[in-house]
From Swiss-Prot:
Record carries keyword Signal: yes
This protein's name: Conotoxin Cal6.34
Record GO cellular component, one term: extracellular region
UniProt subcellular location: Secreted
Organism: Californiconus californicus
Cleaved signal peptide residues: 1-22
Disulfide bonding pattern of the chain: C26-C37, C29-C43, C36-C54
Length: 57
């Protein structure tokens, strides 16, 4: 039961991450909340220190 709960939580987190990444707004990236922003290609203007996954512009 615990494993099922962990799996459900993981799926929810991943889904939320994809939803945020699909948002064209870079606010999440600039504040460090969006760890998926590299997939949008929209947040490269921000320094990589905000998000280790975002390359420098």
């Amino acid at each position: 039961m615990k494993l099922t709960c962990v799996l459900i939580v993981a799926v929810l987190i991943l889904t939320a991450c994809q939803v945020i990444a699909a948002d064209s707004s870079c606010w999440f990236c600039s504040t460090g909340f969006n760890k998926c922003c590299e997939s949008t290609g929209d947040c490269m203007t921000y320094p990589s220190e905000y998000n280790a996954s975002c390359p420098e512009a």
